[in-house]
């Protein structure tokens, strides 16, 4: 699905990071290692690399990752790209100063084990940044998944992000 969507000359979500990431990236320890989940065409990963982070972008679309690599090159930075399915991806232990999930909507069967591994994957003082649609998005005819199982609200986050201290913004 995503290879077909990204298979265009244009960057379907643009080449600039989300406003949320611009506002909150500085919460990640400076110069640290950052993992971007379901990064697609790379706009957020490239921004983080431009801020001095060592960035790994993981996505199931090799087409998206090729565009991410091209964008990084055009901006004079490097990102490490990993082609992987998040259902099978191991986050590692104390491997990341930051994990970024920008509109990475996953079915609960994939999301729950991934979220359960976040606390172990972050270094002490590490930060998880999440920007996501909530079930309220279904009332609108704009973007996002149409399957409520792929959307999260505050109660879902409190239940699934066990072992993490977090703030809802």
Regions from the language model: what does each represent?
Residues 1-29, 136:
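Conserved class I S-adenosyl-L-methionine
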Residues 61-63:
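Conserved SAM/SAH-binding beta-strand->alpha-helix loop
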Residues 75-86:
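Conserved SAM-binding strand-loop segment of SAM-dependent methyltransferases
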Residues 87-98:
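A short acidic, Gly/Pro-enriched loop at the edge of an enzyme's catalytic core
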Residues 96-112:
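A short SAM/SAH-binding and catalytic strip from SAM-dependent methyltransferases
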Residues 112-124:
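A short glycine-rich, Lys/Arg-flanked "PGG" loop and its adjoining helix->strand segment in the class I
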Residues 125-133:
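Conserved beta-strand signature within the Rossmann-like core of class I S-adenosyl-L-methionine
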Residues 149-169:
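Short alpha-helix
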């Amino acid at each position: 699905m995503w290879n077909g969507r990204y298979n265009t000359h244009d960057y379907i979500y643009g080449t600039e990071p989300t406003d949320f990431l611009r506002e909150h990236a500085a919460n990640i320890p400076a110069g640290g290692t950052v993992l971007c989940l379901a990064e697609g065409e790379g706009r957020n990963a490239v921004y983080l690399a431009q801020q001095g982070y060592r960035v790994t972008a993981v996505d199931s679309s090799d087409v998206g990752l090729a565009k991410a690599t091209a964008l990084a090159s055009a901006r004079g930075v490097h990102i490490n790209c990993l082609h992987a399915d998040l259902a099978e991806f191991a986050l590692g232990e104390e491997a990341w100063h930051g994990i970024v999930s920008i509109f990475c909507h996953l079915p609960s069967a994939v999301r729950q084990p991934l979220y359960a591994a976040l606390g172990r994957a972050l270094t002490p003082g590490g930060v998880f940044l999440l920007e996501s649609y909530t079930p309220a998005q279904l009332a609108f005819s704009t973007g996002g998944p149409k399957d409520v199982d792929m959307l999260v609200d505050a109660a879902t986050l409190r239940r699934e992000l066990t072992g993490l201290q977090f703030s809802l913004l």
